[in-house]
Amino acid sequence: MIIFNLRFKHNSMMRFFLLLIFLFPVITFAQPDRWQQRVKYTMNIDMDVNTNQFKGKQKLEYTNNSPDVLNKLFYHLYFNAFQPNSSMDVRSQELGKNFINGRGDWDARVRDRISKLTDKEIGYQKIISLKINGVPQPFKYHETILEVNLVKPIAPKSKVVIDMDFEAQVPLQVRRSGRDNPTTGVRYSMSQWYPKLCEYDYEGWHPTPYIAREFYGVWGDYDVTINIDKTYKLGGTGMLINANEIGWGYDAPNTELKPITKEKRTWHFVGNNVHDFVWAADPDYKHLVRKMPNGGPTLNVIYNYIENNPKNDSAWNEVADAAVIALPYMESKFGKYPYPQYSFIHGGDGGMEYPMATLISGPGLGTVFHEWMHSWYQMMLGTNESLYPWMDEGFTSYAEDLVSKFYNKKSSLQGLKETLQRNPNNKNLADLIPILPEDHSSAYAGYYALVKSGYEEPLTTHSDHYNTNFAYSNAAYAKGEVFMEQLGYIIGADTRDKVLLEYYNEWHFKHPNSSDFIQVAEKVSGIKLDWYKEYFCSTTKTVNYGIDSLWEEVGVTKIRLRRIGQMPMPIDLQLTFKDGSTEMHYMPLNLMFGEKPNENAAQKREVHEEWRWTHPTYVVEVKHKLTDITAVEIDPSKRMTDVDRKNNLLELKW
């Protein structure tokens, strides 16, 4: 009997195994019956570009589809965050006192900038009057939240009309919204610019104070009229209704802004079935238009024109061309884009998503693909980002990686390898590459860094209440993306792709939560997955498996595997033989009550008895002589988030 004990001797050599992902037709199920509140905004604002202030009138038709009597309303007043000593200001400065990896843990765009804003640079939103069905209502400010105590409650299944007059001042650009961005040069990036009704759902009201994190809105229709200096050019959510009066590429390609005698021009946008409205304005904007074939959406690219800079023009034209190429792939993987237009607008402070539009600070295609994919994972699905930021940023980052691979014809791991070739002294990257999967490799690297840091918090943490920006960003973006790729390891990549399409079909425009997603995944896969959500999202327990020992008895090789970490998983175990052939041995987890299909039809696979989660070890028996085996490896695809892979591969030399 020959025994190899690997508890103290490990082989660090790794091999990569790329699993191909194919798209399968989607399975359909009954749509969930969950009530949704409904809004219809009609707004008219008058902007003064000299004072950066505007006055607005808002008519809001609010339908209470809930079974509840509403005694209060809550509104977001986001601009009020941009004042010294605001919650956003103090929160940013407090986080900046934490030093992680030698740097202050604050958003570099915010830092302590709010504390230094002058009276003319701050933002504010003030309510002048508020009436419901003609009756004045008392209201109270809570910084970025307006509380309205109703004179008469709103009955279930009823509709009210809310009329509001308000005034606002656009803050100097600090985060997302604002004026006079020093980086982009854009005059106005107008997100979170109007008093916005908070969402009321099956959990009640969500009056979340604004500290620069996430959003949650009510589905509805927006009719927005903007009166602004006639030299300004605009882009935004929805369709421009008065395109014939405006020109500038909205009425026909390459047309100029139509001359008018009045000092202010009126722009009239309408966007239906959305939960927010964004716009941006600048006198130097240039407008590119692309039409998708076969009746698809119109694609707009609106950017700050720089005279005698053809490189800038070329980069923004590539954005337009890339969007045309990418959209069919995006729809095939994630569902149909249902709106009549989408606009990539130069503005903001990085990249920020909105219905039918995004504000991006530059023409980088990674940001372009990421923000556009937010049209699926937030704009069409509308999860509560504050509670489930990983379903927003994580799912979007997952999709971005695939779209980038499709467009660039290279995987994320290939990109990291090219980076290492350019920077051969980057030891950290050199150590990482062997343990990362072919796709979503940067996300896995981010997750492993989070685990190693000791700052990790559960994904169930409210986005505003993470103790560090470092933990929040790596959880929402990296771990959320890893959640989806690792799901493919558990149920099979092809099945996971079906899940994503069914998730879209079943839940778009319905505000799903994490349990809703898991339920869809269980229906499509036939596998129980509540354990996966609870372990990976509700705890910080980690996956760690190893090859403990192997030996031969009467021509049968036995391999003892050991679960070292606290999170159980199904196991793929690949054997490599002297002739170069391979064989997969699969141990489903007993909590799954099922098994994933063979992901590689060209490779022989044997399904073994399920591994009970209570048992730390498992002995695999294979009908091969030990001396015929040259390598044994746990999860050669490296999609399982094993935090210590040095004991996952054993190479045998005979």
Predicted regions located by residue number:
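N-terminal, polar/Ser/Thr-rich
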Residues: 29-55, 529-531
